């Protein structure tokens, strides 16, 4: 399957073996967890999301030069503690206290902020439920705008980093909290399974190195569902 980008460039989506050369570069690893209200339910006791992020980022950090931890909603909020504390202190209360707009978020804007912070030697990890904040009326029109906003953010990232690769891992986790419907309704869900996504951005050659050292199938014990990869070809 292929998607067309600006200028007719193709973004290939598939499960082919990665043929990119493996880089020896030790990247700067930037981690972002969305801390808007829709993510609160994943912060319950026994959350597979917290275990997955702790395990995956711990393994990636071994291959990285430095690791920075952040929350993100309408702005990037740096976290100054250790990875273990970052995970242990994740609760709806700490999410709200961290700052920013806790009530809603814009996926396209978050991706844009993340990509603007990147260099050719950095890798960014973004964890989100990827729920689009659409109005009750004219939702289809706003959905199209969201899609364009996401596409523009990725294309701007590719202009900055020509060999930018994107991987999206689908995960599931226990969820115990409020679920916000597109029509404005709210339902309290109790210990159901809900999907969320781990986005990985970086130079294709660096991603090839990380994938060889930390295969994503190691997440199978934490709710791994599948992965798609996008790269310029």
Residue positions per predicted region:
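Sec-dependent bacterial lipoprotein signal peptides
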Residues: 1-4
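Bacterial signal peptide processing site
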Residues: 6-10
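Extracytoplasmic/secreted cell-surface and envelope-processing proteins
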Residues: 11-13, 37-44, 77-81, 132-142, ...
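Von Willebrand factor
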Residues: 22-128, 132-133, 165-168, 172
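A charged, solvent-exposed segment within the mature domains of Sec-exported extracytoplasmic proteins
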Residues: 114-188
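Eukaryote-biased recognition of electropositive, low-complexity segments
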Residues: 162-233
């Amino acid at each position: 399957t292929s998607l067309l980008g600006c200028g007719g460039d193709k973004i290939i989506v598939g499960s082919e073996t990665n043929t990119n050369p493996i880089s020896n570069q030790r990247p700067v690893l930037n981690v972002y967890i969305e801390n808007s209200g829709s993510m609160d339910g994943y912060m319950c006791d026994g959350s597979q999301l917290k275990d997955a992020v702790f395990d995956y980022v711990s393994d990636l950090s071994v291959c990285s030069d430095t690791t920075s931890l952040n929350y993100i909603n309408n702005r990037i909020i740096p976290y100054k503690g250790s990875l273990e504390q970052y995970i242990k202190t994740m609760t709806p209360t700490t999410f709200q206290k961290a700052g920013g707009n806790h009530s809603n978020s814009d996926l396209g804007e978050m991706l844009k902020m993340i990509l603007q912070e990147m260099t050719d030697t950095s890798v960014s990890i973004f964890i989100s439920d990827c729920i689009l904040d659409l109005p009750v009326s004219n939702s289809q029109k706003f959905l199209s705008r969201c899609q364009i906003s996401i596409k523009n953010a990725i294309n701007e990232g590719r202009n900055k980093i020509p060999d930018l690769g994107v991987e999206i891992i689908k995960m599931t986790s226990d969820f115990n909290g409020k679920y916000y419907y597109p029509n404005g309704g709210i339902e309290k869900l109790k210990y159901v399974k809900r999907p969320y996504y781990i986005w990985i951005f970086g130079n294709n050659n660096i991603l090839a190195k990380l994938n060889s050292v930390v295969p994503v199938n190691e997440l199978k014990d934490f709710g791994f569902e599948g992965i798609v990869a996008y790269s310029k070809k």
